């Protein structure tokens, strides 16, 4: 029996000469893998609807293993993401993370909305680094590894100058900073943004302008925290680091790509 769902394409890999195995993250059922027969053919009605990051309505026959994709109707192709190598790199990173931390057919409407809203913001041209930071912060609770952000992880105080301790999994106030010689120094702006990114309703996100120095502090905290606690090894993370290096040396921002998160 075919069932209708709202879904985002998070992975598409070639299977044989003409087919694809397409993994969706659906609003109704969570992650679902399907066989899209003939989708590699440019003339196929499944070709456009199985492009990475596409948001649409789909008719799917589910099974315990790989289901069958019957048809799809595009709501938003997210074409702007796929047409820019930097945007595609960031989008690929968040969909791979979503793929790695979720199990098949475990419904999570919150995560669906988080993924959809983030991709829409990326498609609209909002700050990619900030969107990635927000997504990383919010995924910490999904993975069950939330940091201590409301108070000092050692003494519980809520006021003072804070740094971040990977060892203590949260903020350290200036009175307790000597408990971790490897703590990461933070500006007041970084402390505020880490809290904001963790708690903010993403649908209410406005324009956020963040200094490069602050972004470096945020990246230092999140990269170290993920390395220590997440257990994730993401190919797209390594590619993202290479892309950021290209950006720093002035690589042309607009570049055509259709690779997205496929493969």
Curated annotation (Swiss-Prot):
Q: Which NCBIfam families match?
A: reco (TIGR00613)
Full protein name:
DNA repair protein RecO
Describe the task this protein carries out: Involved in DNA repair and RecF pathway recombination.
Mind giving the lineage of the organism this protein is from? Answer: Bacteria, Bacillati, Bacillota, Bacilli, Bacillales
**What GO cellular-component annotations does this UniProt entry give?**
bacterial nucleoid
Protein keywords: DNA damage, DNA recombination, DNA repair
The family classification in the record reads: Belongs to the RecO family.
Per the UniProt entry, what are the Gene Ontology biological process annotations, in alphabetical order? DNA recombination; double-strand break repair
The cross-references to PANTHER family, in alphabetical order and at most eight, read: DNA REPAIR PROTEIN RECO
Which residue windows are transmembrane per the record? none
Pfam families recorded: RecO_C, RecO_N
Organism for this UniProt entry: Geobacillus sp. (strain WCH70)
User: What is the primary gene name for this protein?
Assistant: recO
């Amino acid at each position: 029996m075919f069932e209708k769902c709202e879904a985002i394409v998070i992975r598409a890999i070639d299977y044989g000469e003409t087919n694809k195995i397409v993994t969706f993250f659906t609003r109704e059922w969570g992650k679902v893998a399907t066989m899209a027969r003939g989708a590699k053919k440019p003339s196929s009605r499944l070709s456009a609807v199985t492009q990475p990051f596409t948001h649409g309505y789909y008719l799917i026959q589910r099974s315990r293993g790989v289901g069958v994709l019957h048809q799809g109707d595009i709501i938003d192709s997210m074409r702007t993401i796929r047409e820019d190598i930097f945007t595609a790199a960031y989008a690929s990173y968040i969909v791979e993370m979503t793929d790695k931390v979720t199990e098949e057919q475990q419904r999570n409407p919150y995560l669906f909305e988080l993924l959809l809203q983030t991709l829409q913001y990326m498609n609209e041209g909002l700050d990619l680094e900030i969107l990635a930071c927000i997504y990383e912060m919010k995924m910490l609770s999904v993975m069950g590894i939330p940091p201590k952000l409301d108070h000092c992880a050692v003494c519980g105080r809520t006021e003072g100058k804070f740094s971040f301790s990977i060892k203590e999994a949260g903020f350290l106030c200036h009175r307790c900073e000597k408990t971790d010689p490897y703590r990461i120094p933070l500006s007041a702006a970084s402390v505020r943004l880490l809290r904001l990114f963790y708690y903010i309703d993403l649908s209410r996100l406005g324009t956020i302008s963040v200094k490069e120095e602050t972004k470096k502090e945020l990246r230092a905290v999140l990269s170290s925290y993920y390395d220590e606690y997440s257990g994730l090894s993401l190919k797209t993370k390594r590619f993202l680091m290479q892309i950021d290096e290209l950006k720093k040396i002035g690589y042309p921002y607009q570049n055509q790509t259709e690779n997205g998160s496929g493969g």
